[in-house]
Amino acid sequence: MTRQNLFPPEGMQDYLPDERWHKRRVEAQIRELFSLCGYDEIETPLLEYCDVVSGGGGRLPVEQLFKTFDRSGSVLAVRPDNTLPIARLIAGRMKDVPAPIRVSYVQDIVQYPLPKGGQMRAHTQAGIELMGEGGAQADPSRTLWNLDRALTACLEPLLKESAVSLT
């Protein structure tokens, strides 16, 4: 094993037992907050079809994705963000769920270009999505969004140490 192979690739991170425990503790607190506010946790696969996360409409160019192929030759990409895979899940498997749909997530993402500000290439992203509700009815969720921002500010030191980000 070469010296280079003793360390993870650039922008990736190993977790020692105490680091892993700390990260999981922060994630559990975030999950509990989202649940208390009426958001149900969902999970999407780490690999998505490339066209789900690439192209126009604010999606990343194909060149900025980690890509691989499945056995049938379809191009797959490691998710660089959670919003589009969650929109795919809601449009597909949750299309018959009555609105409003409130979901939360705490899952890993991997970004190809190294993010600015020393952020790791691979990290955990936590957030909420509200689908199918607008106007005055969305006000409680706007409050939650503001709480989400406040939580980010308050937990910033913990989040940096634990490689969890709120979106």
Where are these regions (language model features)?
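TRNA-recognition modules of translation machinery and tRNA-sensing kinases, especially anticodon-binding
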Residues: 1-167
